Amino acid sequence: MSFWLSLIFCFFTFASSSPPDDPVNCEFGNTMCTVTNSYGAFPDRSICKAAKVEYPRTEAELVSIVAAATRAGQKMRVVTRYSHSFPKLVCTDGKDGTLISTKFLNHVVTTNPEAKTLTVESGVTLRQLIEEAAKFDLALPYAPYWWGLTVGGMMGTGAHGSSLWGKGSAVHDYVTEIRLVSPGLASDGYVKVQVLSETIDPEEFRAAKVSLGVLGVISQVTFELQPMFKRSLNYVMRNDSDFGDQAVSFGERHEFADFLWLPSQGKVVYRMDGRVPLNTSGDGLFEFFPFRSQLSLVLAIDRSLEESEESLEDANMKCVRAKLVSSSMFLMSYGVTNNGLIFTGYPVIGMQNHMMSSGSCLDSRQDGLITACPWDPRIKGQFFHQTTFSVSLTNVKSFINDIKALVKIEPKSLCVLEGSNGILIRYVTSSLAFLGKEEKALDFDLTYYRSKNDPLAPRLYEDYIEEIEQMAIFKYNALPHWGKNRNLAFDGAIRKYKNANAFLKVKEKFDSLGLFSTEWTDQILGLKGNVTIVKQGCALEGLCICSEDSHCAPTKGYLCRPGKVYREARVCTRVSS
């Protein structure tokens, strides 16, 4: 079976691999361009175009580009090296806008070991940030697990790791200063460079910490770091019978706690992970298996099996493969090793810079796509939806129990999630950022099958996933992750942020002409229009919530029906003739 081949090859870090393509492709030099994300498709599968792309290498060049576009009244959007956001955050309106890539704004500016601060350009990746800090025995305490994100991208979407400790797990809450290039008046030369900090410009700073790219282009960011430390990691798999209670309190006991929930199997993998003294013995390394380069042939075989299960509606085989994935990943410790080579047992102890993030499939030489990141759109590989939202700790137990109730109705219904290693659940806490998290919460990350070629193809047990999605967002008032999700998750989301109006005031101050705003950002910020798109089959890919059968796939037996546990939900359900 292809999965086992994948596991065998996962033991090796390929010396040659094919890093991802540039998200921007142009017909003539840097003009007549299209832009996409690292998965090759946005939630609505639209093609985003721009008149040109600019690649500034210095802040001076960036200032010149923004001034010229402002003078011309051109729309602008920022695109990062890998463009990992699912929603259309990189798209300009129409085809006449300008894309500003931070691909070459990737330098370290200054390091101050005494003050424990590090200033970098916004195109610096998380990997670069971690490595540069480690040179001075410093560490970023919390970060996402994927190191291919850029500093500007993380701040634009509120990216985070997992913790309730300190200031919480969001990267932007460890930022002390932001340099932002915004449109200006003619008297300003059509551009302004804003230097923002909590002490001098608290309102503007709190807006810029999570900005969705609508305030301008982040040029530089200064981080407040901590002395280097070690972590001790242990994964434990348990029955999920008391998971609702454990989820509420576990994060208070373990600084870097998270969970992998396997609801169809009734199991949870607990991450017991905390700091230990720097002189503790251990040279552990976490290189997450799914983030390593994998053979394109193996990925194609695996995808073909997945497509076959869907077309044949073979839930039994889907569940068998899901158990193989989850049990094998657990047995092989998800890619963590005690010495950088092999896993010999828990606990695994290692330096923070070696334990916090990974993503080696990004970093190797071209090999003609013999190997690639698993989701690279140039090959037949993974293609998926990602639904991610944070549920308040006060509501988490009830939400977990509702999911369990769905599983009780049909135990096979959530095997599709376990084929992607289960529901990843991370801790987040309240942030001073206007569009950051509002309170202590658990962030649920659901990754599941999406048809590559047919947006009107229904998915096996899709009604169960849709009900969880709607239950979280509407019953439990969950906040969507700004850089993930399908359209419907953002419906009315801005009303859940108590400081939304304060953010919009700063937006008006920095970009009164809306040159960095688009139809999409106006929709998610509640300024104009709606994020949902109502048309035939729109509910199948989360573009709408169904209100009639035509929004599903009636010719294939999928009709719009109420939810099974959350009756207010409206989901596309397979109805037997």
UniProtKB/Swiss-Prot annotation:
Domain FAD-binding PCMH-type: residue ranges: 46-228
GO MF annotation list: D-arabinono-1,4-lactone oxidase activity; FAD binding; L-gulonolactone oxidase activity
Coiled-coil annotated spans: none
Example of a GO biological process term: L-ascorbic acid biosynthetic process
Annotated family: Belongs to the oxygen-dependent FAD-linked oxidoreductase family.
NCBIfam families with a match to the protein in the record: pln_FAD_oxido (TIGR01677)
Protein name: Probable L-gulonolactone oxidase 4
Organism: Arabidopsis thaliana (Mouse-ear cress)
